[in-house]
Regions:
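Glycine/proline-rich active-site loop of Rossmann-fold NAD(P)-dependent oxidoreductases
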Residues: 138, 151, 163-179, 186
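Hydrophobic residues in alpha-helical segments
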Residues: 84, 185-186
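Conserved catalytic core of Hanks-type protein kinase domains
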Residues: 74, 184-185
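N-terminal Rossmann-like NAD(P)+-binding domain of SDR-like oxidoreductases, especially those catalyzing
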Residues: 1-163
Length: 186
């Protein structure tokens, strides 16, 4: 089993589509649908969608823990401007929720792929405190580094830079910059 947090979102849904085509893994998507949507669901018997917050991952996936190969943690609050407007939601998702994902992986020896952000490494790392979003994401990277030192926790980090493509959000408060441009152009 591969678990994808944020599986109903832009990046997560495209990853699910790829994994369904290229692997034989069963897939569990965890999403709170704050920016993800059911229209992004990949209809396939190998995919199961669960509506929940990442902070509840342990109690929800406990029965699957010995069957999970890896977790792709893409389900975090992910907009800079909105992190000022909804700082509590940003912290709940990116700090509390991510901590639960990290602990679940660590406790059950599950491989983790973490989605970092260019917002926390801009200006040679000096921009990591420019927004609640960048701050929480940079602190998560520090936590992962410490988990590696303390417990030999193994993980991989991927960085996304203005991603675009199928299922991107083109309108509303969670729209991506490229999605807004596309929406105005079309």
């Amino acid at each position: 089993i591969i678990v994808i947090t944020g599986g109903a979102g832009f990046v997560g849904s495209n990853l699910i589509k790829f994994l369904v085509k290229k692997t034989n893994f069963k897939i569990i998507s965890i999403d709170n649908y704050s920016s993800g949507t059911k229209k992004n669901h990949i209809i396939n018997s190998k995919v199961k969608y669960l509506k929940l917050n990442t902070k509840d991952i342990s109690k929800t996936l406990n029965s699957y823990k010995n069957k999970i190969n890896s977790i792709f943690h893409f389900g975090e609050f992910s907009r800079i401007y909105q992190s000022f407007v909804n700082m509590n939601l940003c912290i709940e998702s990116n700090t509390i929720g991510s901590n639960e994902v990290f602990n679940f992986c660590l406790s059950n020896k599950i491989k983790l792929v973490y989605s970092a952000t260019s917002a926390s490494i801009g200006n040679s790392g000096q921009d990591k405190n420019l927004s609640p979003y960048a701050f929480t994401k940079s602190k998560n990277l520090e936590m992962l580094e410490n988990l590696k030192k303390w417990f030999k926790f193994e993980y991989e980090v991927v960085y996304f830079y203005n991603v675009y493509g199928p299922n991107q959000i083109c309108s509303g408060s969670m729209a991506t910059v490229i999605g807004i441009f596309e929406n105005q152009y079309l």
